[in-house]
């Protein structure tokens, strides 16, 4: 395959001018061989395994970044859901396990560690319940541990008892962490995937190898620049530009993943194609949608534009790699996207519109700040709505919502770094308390009649 000089310059520009980066190299680590009936032994086993398997990750990422001239922003670890690993200990709290994860992750220098998780789509074991009830204190006493709960799936339906508990857990976490920051590290899923390299929802699935490398790329700025510089007029042509750009982005991620796998002697798992924005100007998913012809993200037509973007990214990425997995689409985290922040501040991008957008994009209601006095049952209702979209449409959906204590609509909250800042958005006045308190399970949907 011949490479033109223009294509080489394009790749250089992607990094130099358009905020292209490999967002994360994540090592997934299986912890089943760490299980012990003694929680102290369990913690020591977990620490030893993480620090052994992950010891060279940061140095490898730095070497590859220098070798290829591509920034590798984060190095992360994901582990088997702790509710499964800690069950044999019969402990009444798993906060010490979260602290062990935090300590191990800091020892090897990674940015985040995920997997303080419970998979409860069909029911909660005593261990699942202990883990979920440990989340607020775990988020308060750790710095880089991320937590997730899978409350539903297309096969199992939605576990409304877990949804209720998740809402209460998020509310409690918001109350005991500064400006609700602990909630930025909690994701509630429907149809969670087992090979996600992105935080805060990463965990290492039970069907995975002992250790595996998953890579997440990011290039909203590259896609926007490609559209700006193209002469595409119809949406068919726009989709083609996005597809070709996604191909180029994916090839870089594939190269980095394969090289990291070889150097670390850990199998290469998947490449997640998700366009993950940052608060930096020029690195926004919202601005891509506006480049397609919307005056502001959130206006009518936004869901259609996002559907086009998401599908084109997947098509381009699939041609570039045989190892596409994870979430693979476009993320729409409000606080992490400069264009989304502006649209929300203008009052055009609302919670309702974001919910509609999640029906066609990669994940869900992400990094949304709501008033601190939002009741737990309202948070549970938002989670249930989002889970229903995922369940019916056979896709991953998720909620990462932050009730900010002491703040109300019109205020904003600063999270810093990649997490950015967010305007506090209004929630509905009506109550869903009776509905949420009913509990039980919303049955799995029929598959044969799709309307």
Swiss-Prot record:
Pfam families: DUF711. InterPro entries: UPF0210. Transmembrane segments: none annotated. Homodimer. Belongs to the UPF0210 family. HAMAP family: UPF0210. This is UPF0210 protein NMCC_1554. It comes from Neisseria meningitidis serogroup C (strain 053442). The lineage of its organism: Bacteria, Pseudomonadati, Pseudomonadota, Betaproteobacteria, Neisseriales.
